[in-house]
Amino acid sequence: MDSENTFKNYFDLNPSLILNFSGPNSILKRSYIKYSEDLRSLTVRYELSLFPDFISLFFSHEKPYKAFYPLVNSDVDKTDYTGVVIYVGDVYNNTFGSKKLEDSFFIKIYDENIRPYFDKRMVSSEALKKWGMLEYSNDVLYSNKNRVGYRPLKLVAKSIYGKNNTDIILDEYSINKLFSNSNNIKLLQDGKLVIIK
């Protein structure tokens, strides 16, 4: 789910979440029923809509949180980007061995001093319900222009972070480029973020 919690952690912390998967108000929708020829067994398939039904269980804000943006920087990039693409495809080494970025519904972006700059609370609830905080891709030439448009800001991660290896560390140049422009912050709030793995 995110850098601190798996699905199991969320359900352990809030056991009432399970109620959303049963009963008349279940977010699971029955999509297929088939009886065996001898009527001794029944196959039932359920569908779960990740957006908006499932994802809405894991955030509570209505408006995006805005802490300190935009950064004040004399070298502000005034380019009008249409999305943000961050390449995080490398294997990163540290004292505990090598690690690769793990997929997650919610990520955080940190600077090299592990100061947090971005998390799910900073994304609008409308964007989270529409398509989530971000999209992952293995395609370096990512082509979903609906998400990031034709002129995305392209950055390369310095490293990854978090208990579950889901968060991104950007160098100072990238942090300044991303967070010194209010248009870029709006792109993040709108979920126009793609991570290339």
Question: Can you say where each PLM-predicted feature lies in the sequence?
Answer:
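Domain-level marker for long, solvent-exposed, non-transmembrane regions
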Residues: 1-197
